Amino acid sequence: MRHAIPRRLEAPDLEWAVALLGQAMAAHPALSYVCAPPIGARRQHWLLRQLLDYVFRHGVAYTNAAGTALVLWLHPTELRRPWALQLRLLLPAIWWLGWAGSQRLRRLIRTVAWLRRQSLAGPHHLLLGVAVHPAAQGRGEGRRLLAATLALRQSPLPCYFSGQVPSQLAFYQGLGFELAGHCTVGEGPAGVLSNWGLLRPAARK
């Protein structure tokens, strides 16, 4: 099955992509865990902007023709430097998110990285997320965009994704991902945050 070629985002796309990501993730449990009240929308925007800027520098972000969906990947080589994202985020996070918020962010990053190391070894593609504008959800746009970007992975490496929304696991399993592990991140203001690791085996040559 042929997929429409997605558009790779460039630096001028950053601000609208952050806005789209913020709308799509407004109720995401990981964002709610890190950015619990009284952290406001401006500080959530800062966190998402840092994430996207990191992807622009060390990975690739794609959108569909309508600009209603995003898929974020990190390059396999970047995964050899697990400290880089922490260094970029954690020190300024103390100012932006407060001490409690910065510690929850630290715990989330470290727990997700720990489960990934337990689930696989060696080079792999890391899927950071799929985001769809609320008005476009339920139309299959996220599925089509993710499928198209999976087809663009040029090296025969496995793909890994960390998810915190149990109702979305079937979405990724329908695209070839398999459940690889589960762990608890911690207790947040909204309750316990859990994390699932999903692994898509390397394509056969």
Residue ranges and their predicted role:
Residues 38-60:
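Active-site rim helix/loop that mediates acceptor-substrate recognition in acyltransferases
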Residues 53-74:
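Conserved beta-hairpin
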Residues 19-38:
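Helix-loop element at the rim of GNAT/NAT acetyltransferase active sites that forms part
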Residues 143, 159, 165-183, 189-190:
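Conserved active-site alpha-helix within GNAT-family acetyltransferase domains
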